[in-house]
Every structure is written in structure tokens, then in C-alpha cells.
């Protein structure tokens, strides 16, 4: 799929070059538009957003401020994250996966971040890149997380208050679409924790493209990433492409209603080694205020 995207871009560039040879005015317009595009592209890599959502529910018994971050992919972006944490002062920092790439050698910038923040506030669920680590690398990575006292949430639950339950969902790498193994509701039930209906249940699950499954397990709120905002974003259209090699993914960035469940998807902070692309799509962290009604 990504080859098709690049091929399409190459064809369009070739067409524009040909048209420029036919019309000088058209050529000037194309040059101006290209400069604007390059400026916007640069801003996508430099700019950093903080987006906010308030959630007010009867089942929430305590006001809690959460910072959601996802898909750092070991990018050197620590200064901006540390500044955001200092300014926002969240009660909890939730990391919904792919904070590193698929090798223990590709973790240094994430470790630098952990050196600079209050890591015992962090609740972390793995994404496909952590799950792709070799067994040896994964053992080493567990040691790093233990050293920094990270709360690893993979298929576990914790109480944030008397009535707010936070659960993590991690599933074997084989189930990601690019590996070809189709997931079922039965598969989900083996990994998802059971919800207490009278509690406010939050799920941290890397991949929002499975939202239709998550909602069947009575979660009130799902926090995700994975899709990188659709990589390329256009006004009124949204995200174009997902890491699962799918055009126009349904969930890319922001807040969605999926049945009775609310889904909040972070567009992430970086880009993977496989597809180094963010266009009109700056990195972000998300602030979620859980408020008593």
C-alpha cells in the first residue's frame, strides 16, 4: 500500500512538471503551492499540540486529569513533552503503546524521557512495536521499565479511585492486520478484563480499529493511538492512511462515540521506521479531564 502512495505522488509530480513546461503562469502557481506545502510539511514535524477533552459522568467519583501519549517511536521530542507535563500537572500519564521501535537499540530517546519525568505516574500498555521485540530484547525492556517503576498495564487492571477502574489490553503481534491473523470476539475475551458495570471502566488499547469489539465488553472509555492521525491529514477529510495499510481509517484522531463507549484516539508523537510520514499532522498529547457530575 505505501508503495502505491509513493508511486501516486511520483506520478503527480511528473504530471505537474510536464504541465509546467506548457504554461509559465501555471508553473509559477505550482511553485508557490509547492513552497506552501513544504512549509506546512515542516510545521507538521516541528509543531506540537495539546488537545483537550472533558468527560462528565455520574459514575466518575473523583476529578482526575489524565495525559495520554502514544506512538513516540523513540523520537527525540523529550523537551516538549517535559514542558507539557510541567505545565499541565496531570494526575496520571497514560502511554498507549509504540513508545519505542522494535529493537532494544531503538529506545534511547524514550529512556531519556523517563529520566526526566515522574515515572511512577505512568501507566503503560504495549503496542505492536513493543510486541515485535525479540524475546531477548523484551526481557531487557522489562528490566528497563522495572528500573523506572513504570506501571505496566498489559492485560491488568488497577483502581484510580473507588469507582474508576483502569485496564490495559495487549494482544500478540500476530493479530495486527499486516500479519494477516484476523481477530475475533472470542480472542478478545481471552485478553480483556471483565468490567464491573457499576464502575467507570477505562480501557487502554493501542489499536482503535478494534473499537467495535471493545464496546461489547462494557467499557465506558477507550484510550488509543496506533493510527498516527492517518499520517496525512486534509481539512474536512481527516486521516488518509493507517499503519495497517488501510486507506481512510475510521478512527484517526480525536473523540468518537462507539455505541455506549467513548473512544479517544491520540494521533501520536512520532512515526515508525517503516513509514516515516506525517503531513499536515503535528504530534500531540491529549489531556482528558474526568469530572464528577
Features from the language model and the residues they span:
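Non-catalytic terminal accessory segments
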Residues: 1-49
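Alpha-helical transmembrane signal-anchor/signal-peptide segments
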Residues: 47-59
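Beta-strand-turn-beta hairpins that frame and shape the catalytic cleft
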Residues: 56-67, 150, 157-168, 197, ...
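Membrane-embedded segments
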Residues: 62-153
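Active-site metal-binding loops of divalent metal-dependent hydrolases
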Residues: 70-74, 97-99, 128-130, 156-157, ...
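Short, Asp-centered acidic motifs that coordinate Mg2+ and/or phosphate
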Residues: 91-92, 123, 150-151, 164, ...
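Binuclear metal-dependent hydrolase catalytic cores centered on His/Asp/Glu-rich metal-binding motifs
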Residues: 139, 143-148, 161-201, 211-212, ...
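Conserved beta-sheet core of the metallophosphoesterase superfamily
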Residues: 207-286
Amino acid at each position: 500500500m505505501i508503495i502505491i502512495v509513493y508511486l501516486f505522488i511520483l506520478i503527480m509530480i511528473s504530471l505537474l512538471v510536464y504541465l509546467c513546461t506548457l504554461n509559465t503562469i501555471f508553473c509559477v502557481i505550482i511553485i508557490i503551492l509547492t513552497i506552501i506545502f513544504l512549509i506546512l510539511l515542516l510545521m507538521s514535524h516541528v509543531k506540537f499540540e495539546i488537545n483537550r477533552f472533558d468527560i462528565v459522568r455520574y459514575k466518575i467519583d473523583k476529578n482526575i486529569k489524565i495525559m495520554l501519549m502514544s506512538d513516540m517511536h523513540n523520537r527525540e521530542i523529550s523537551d516538549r513533552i517535559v514542558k507539557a507535563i510541567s505545565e499541565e500537572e496531570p494526575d496520571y500519564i497514560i502511554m498507549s503503546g509504540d513508545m519505542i521501535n522494535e529493537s532494544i537499540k531503538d529506545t534511547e530517546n524514550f529512556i531519556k524521557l523517563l529520566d526526566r519525568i515522574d515515572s511512577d505516574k505512568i501507566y503503560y500498555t504495549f503496542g505492536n512495536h513493543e510486541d515485535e521485540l525479540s524475546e531477548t530484547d523484551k526481557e531487557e525492556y522489562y528490566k528497563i521499565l522495572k528500573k523506572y517503576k513504570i506501571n505496566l498495564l498489559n492485560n491488568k487492571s488497577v483502581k484510580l479511585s473507588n469507582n474508576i477502574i483502569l485496564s490495559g489490553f495487549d494482544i500478540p503481534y500476530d493479530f495486527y492486520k499486516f500479519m494477516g491473523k484476523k481477530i475475533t470476539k472470542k480472542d478478545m475475551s481471552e485478553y480483556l478484563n471483565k468490567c464491573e458495570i457499576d464502575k467507570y471502566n477505562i480501557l487502554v488499547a493501542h489499536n482503535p480499529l478494534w473499537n467495535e469489539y471493545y464496546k461489547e465488553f462494557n467499557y465506558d472509555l477507550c484510550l488509543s493511538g496506533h493510527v498516527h492521525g492517518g499520517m496525512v491529514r486534509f481539512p474536512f477529510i481527516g486521516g488518509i492512511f493507517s499503519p495497517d495499510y488501510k486507506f481512510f481509517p475510521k478512527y484517526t484522531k480525536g473523540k468518537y462515540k462507539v455505541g455506549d463507549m467513548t473512544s479517544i484516539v491520540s494521533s501520536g508523537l512520532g512515526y515508525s521506521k517503516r513509514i516515516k510520514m506525517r503531513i499536515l499532522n503535528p504530534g500531540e498529547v491529549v489531556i482528558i479531564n474526568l469530572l464528577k457530575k
